[in-house]
Amino acid sequence: MFIRAGQYKSRPRVLAGIFLRSRDTQAERARRKAEEIEELRRDRQHVQRDLASAQEKIADMKIQIVQLKIDNQQRQPPVLPHDPALPCHEFGPKIISVCVNLAANVGLRASVRCMDIVLAWLGVDERLPDWTTVRGWLMRMGVAALEAPIEQADDWIWMADHSNQIGQEKALAIIGLRASKMPSPGTAIRHEDVRLLMFEPGINWKTADMSAAYERLAEKAGQPLAVLTDGACELRDGALTLQNDRPDTLLVGDFKHHAANVLKQVVGADERFSKFTSQTGSTRSAIQQTELAHLMPVSVRPKAGFMNLSATLKWANMVLWHLSHPHSAAREQITPGRMNDKLGWLRSFRDDVARWSRCQDVVSLSVTFVNEQGLFCGAADQLSRRFRSLELCGASQTVADGLLEFLRDHELKLQDGQRLPMSPEILESCFGLFKQLERQHSKGGFTSLLASFGALLQLATPESVRDAFSRVSVKQMRTWVSDNLGTTVPSKRKTAYAESKTVA
């Protein structure tokens, strides 16, 4: 300091005072800045606390808003989706598709009742169609499915069968699927995999009639790659005419029907089996109104024959087990004397039932294999290897040989890489859906409801409803019924009763 003091004109004492005052001034300024910084820090902390509090309040308010929306929705009655009515209709395609799908599953009258129950539960005041209206919708959908354009292709596989109830009328149904669109091996054919190609009611379905029907369908869809039928000769022989225009058209037999025939040849030819079935029928009548009713033999339709043998054998094995286990829960309140008197006869058939069950095991395994895998080169060899998992005896080996021979005979008709279905169970299932729709009327003869058959294969959607109703009017649907059904058995019955009242 003093070394450089010569630079200044003022005295050192004056300079020292100036420097001391400057230092004090800077110190005071620094102190004030520090106080300002501390005050700003405190303000920042207050702001952060206020911000956190505000964020908590916002989160709480969001929760309250969600709850208020829920409460508001609960207070307001539900409304059905927007569904403008179709032209010249009182209802929209959404409600129509729902009613049609319900009718196909639970019945016509029940479909409207179900809708009424659901809407009442939701608190929705909505007018519903009458069940007769739903019936008309279903019939229009069926006719539209039948008259929809068929894709021309050379790999159609047809499945043909007849359905009849009472009277002379039979309905010919032919469904089809493309070989190129078959489900992958291991997957059975579903309703959505097929489409209705032909559906014609008629009285006479002889070989010539079937040939004409096949030719009419071939004009629309092209010559088929294969035709699958059951054992009915008119269905099988009628398809021979198709080979005139396409020699490589394959005629495929129904594996399940053949399996039932093999069972009939092996098991049905057993004298013991005739005695067994006779005793089974007597037992059913004897115990159906007693304390043994839960052990009653199953009811088997005579027409089903050996196709439903498994249910009877399952019953026999169940009863034989309980005969050997007197303390089973199923035998409570049944005295040993009553059990032996009514069901003890099965003991003498124990070995027979075991033998027949082994035959049925062969058939069950084979039918499942064919349903899932189809017919292909090497199918018989694969099935033969699966038989190794079964306990075979002389009778069951005979059944196995008969089924393998049937497969090998069909394999000879195939080209390399071809794979075809060998069971029309999907078509039989379609007939079952129709009988389910008819309910108690399924034994009274065909009615105009037959027009709805084509609507049962696919679920209705708003889009399919629009398409079907744009192509088939009520008048066209009634024309189809008039042209194809004529006077039905129920109509004739109604006329007969009406005439008798008039005369009386």
Regions found by a protein language model. Give the residues of each.
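RNase H-like nuclease fold core
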Residues: 67, 74, 78-93, 108, ...
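RNase H-like polynucleotidyl transferase catalytic core
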Residues: 248-264, 417, 423
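Heptad-repeat positions
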Residues: 23-26, 30, 37-40, 44-47, ...
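A polyampholytic, Gly/Pro-enriched intrinsically disordered region
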Residues: 267-288
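Glycine- and acidic
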Residues: 93-101, 119-123, 195-199, 412-416, ...
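Short, charged amphipathic recognition helices of the HTH superfamily
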Residues: 102-119
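Acidic/histidine-rich catalytic cores and adjacent linkers
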Residues: 33, 51, 58, 232-242, ...
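Basic, short loop/linker segments at the boundary and entry of helix-turn-helix/winged-helix-like folds
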Residues: 3-14, 28, 37, 63-101, ...
